[in-house]
Amino acid sequence: MLEKQRSTAETFGIPLAVLLEITHRCPLQCPYCSNPVELDRSGKELTTDEWKKVLSELAEIGVLQVHFSGGEPTARKDLVELVKHASDVGLYTNLITSAVLLTRERLSELADAGLCHVQISFQGVEEGLADRVAGYRNAHRKKLEVAKWTRELDLPLTVNAVMHRQNLHQLPDIIQMSIDLDADRLEVANVQYYGWALKNRAALMPTVAQLDECTRLVEEARERLKGRLSIDYVVPDYYALRPKKCMGGWGRQFFNISPAGKVLPCHAAESITGLDFESVRSNHSIAWIWQNSEAFNRYRGTGWMKEPCKSCEFREIDFGGCRCQAFALTGDAANTDPACALSPLHETIFKQAEREAEGETNRFLYRNFAGGTLEPENDA
């Protein structure tokens, strides 16, 4: 069955790397959480055997890398078993983690099982601010400890720093922290404002001046640290003239699998109402879902586009921008992403971002299974 699907799936090219969100459970309460607004409960999660079947199928259809993510992937007791199975079927494995639940013993077990790489998220460099953003006491201290263990176990390390108005001033120190931790790579990822982050946009949106300085610092550090630290940079696009080529275009270069087994064109895709996403629990193979499912084909390519995207010279470069952002801001995922200057809403969101960035709102609506908790006023 899988062999029959291999050739058809290659029409769009099975991605070399796939994101596996094995759980939405997470001890952190980050206000910019990229998981769907409606989280999958633990009772809906794929079982160990189901995830093993997924891993075997991914390897068979040509996937080379899997990224174990969440939520917090270490919340699953079977993570070592899953990593070992992935390694056994020839997959490169990366753990994307907050690190706060890890012990040195368990990290060592993961390394012995074949884990190839660790990516740890950091909310800042100063413990008070970092723990406040995470909504979790002593998180920053634990992250530093786990980063040290990672290098002691000779595992490559990526530092993921999610940036916003309240921590952008720490970027020079974050770059230095990455060097001090002997990280191979730093991902400077500005918050993307959909899903839960949209609820906290007024507390997170940077000013234009902050973003310009952030870009300057990244460019300077890339040149200065060439060959020592690789730096990836993800910018927010509210202030841009052209939208980002989100995920390389819908259904073209990326898919992820949710805790409940849904195969998604991006981790925020379930925010678009009216789309039904196929599950690995269905009778269809993953390759069939990638190639033939209605959800993946809805916004794939350019045939779905309305004006001004339809006749735009950049339509096969940025593919109209982010479908999730278009839906969040306009109510129609087929509309031009308002980050684009050609969108009739572009000026509106630009001005709104400026107002929010200059505002005095700093309190977070924390992310949790209770539906969100507003940060106490005296803590903001």
Curated annotation (Swiss-Prot):
Judged by the first EC level, this protein's enzyme class is: oxidoreductase
- What InterPro entries does this protein's entry cite? 4Fe4S-binding_SPASM_dom (IPR023885), Aldolase_TIM (IPR013785), Elp3/MiaA/NifB-like_rSAM (IPR006638), MoaA_NifB_PqqE_Fe-S-bd_CS (IPR000385), PQQ_synth_PqqE_bac (IPR011843), PqqE-like (IPR017200), Radical_SAM_PqqE_MftC-like (IPR050377), rSAM (IPR007197)
In terms of Gene3D superfamilies, this protein maps to: Aldolase class I
- Which GO molecular function, any one, fits this protein according to its record? cyclase activity
Residues involved in [4Fe-4S] cluster binding: C26, C30, C33
One of the protein's GO biological processes: pyrroloquinoline quinone biosynthetic process
Q: Does the keyword Ion transport apply?
A: no
* Listed cofactors: [4Fe-4S] cluster
Q: Which UniProt keywords apply?
A: 4Fe-4S, Iron, Iron-sulfur, Metal-binding, Oxidoreductase, PQQ biosynthesis, S-adenosyl-L-methionine
One Pfam family of this protein, by short name?
A: Fer4_12
Kindly tell me the pathway this chain contributes to: Cofactor biosynthesis; pyrroloquinoline quinone biosynthesis
EC number(s) given by UniProt: 1.21.98.4
Q: How is the cofactor bound?
A: Binds 1 [4Fe-4S] cluster. The cluster is coordinated with 3 cysteines and an exchangeable S-adenosyl-L-methionine.
Q: Where is the Radical SAM core domain?
A: 12-228
Q: Which reaction does it catalyse?
A: [PQQ precursor protein] + S-adenosyl-L-methionine = E-Y cross-linked-[PQQ precursor protein] + 5'-deoxyadenosine + L-methionine + H(+)
Relate the protein's function as given in its record.
Answer: Catalyzes the cross-linking of a glutamate residue and a tyrosine residue in the PqqA protein as part of the biosynthesis of pyrroloquinoline quinone (PQQ).
- What quaternary arrangement does the UniProt entry report? Interacts with PqqD. The interaction is necessary for activity of PqqE.
Family, according to the entry, reads as follows: Belongs to the radical SAM superfamily. PqqE family.
Q: What name has this protein been given in UniProt? A: PqqA peptide cyclase
Chain's gene name: pqqE
